[in-house]
Amino acid sequence: MVKVIASSLRKGNVVDKDGKLYVILFAENIHPGKGTPVTQLDMRRIGDGVKVSERYRTTEQVERAYVEEREHTFLYADGEGFHFMNPETYDQVAVSEAVVGDAAPYLQEGMPVQVSQFNGIAISLVLPQRATFEVVETEPTTKGQTASSSYKPAVLSNGVRTAVPPHIAPGTRVVVMTADGSYVERAKD
């Protein structure tokens, strides 16, 4: 364990609080006009998945645990969880649904994913920033609508709802951000 100041903590870091380990889901440094700057952390306890919010003064010392980060390839999902393989050692890791969380719909077979492990237990994962999916359902474009920069609702092949430009039709492959499902561009493949 290493002591660090609270303002240096980021998403994915593991901290020791009262003898229990927590993975940081969200970290924000807040500088009010009056008063002491603070770091707001949303964390999930490793082991039972309880979510906790904490506030630390930005200069306060916090125990950060060493986490091993390795690239893995997503294989499949089943009743036991989501299965990933280390491409160097061919070791497989099962990751629980609680750890995968909102990233589940964006996982595609063969997708490279950063898996963070603490003492051999997967505690968090980071997807690539962008992923490509097919549009399965969207409204038809009405004449004259193409000149405006308005977006229309669409459903992707992974079930995620997003907004796409009017020229996108069902069957078109699009690139979306895995963080929020927002449209980036039409796929070039």
From Swiss-Prot:
The keyword Cytoplasm applies. One of its GO terms (molecular function) is translation elongation factor activity. Keywords: Cytoplasm, Elongation factor, Protein biosynthesis. GO terms for biological process: peptide biosynthetic process. Pathway: Protein biosynthesis; polypeptide chain elongation. It holds the Pfam family EFP_N. It comes from the Bacteria. Signal peptide: none annotated. InterPro entries: Elong-fact-P_C, NA-bd_OB-fold, Rib_uL2_dom2, Transl_elong_fac_P/YeiP, Transl_elong_KOW-like, Transl_elong_P/YeiP_cen, Transl_elong_P/YeiP_CS, Transl_elongation_fac_P. The keyword Protein biosynthesis applies. GO terms for cellular component: cytoplasm. CDD domains: S1_EF-P_repeat_1, S1_EF-P_repeat_2. Its main location: cytoplasm. It is found in: Cytoplasm. Belongs to the elongation factor P family. Involved in peptide bond synthesis. Stimulates efficient translation and peptide-bond synthesis on native or reconstituted 70S ribosomes in vitro. Probably functions indirectly by altering the affinity of the ribosome for aminoacyl-tRNA, thus increasing their reactivity as acceptors for peptidyl transferase. This is Elongation factor P 2. It comes from Mesorhizobium japonicum (strain LMG 29417 / CECT 9101 / MAFF 303099). The gene is efp2.
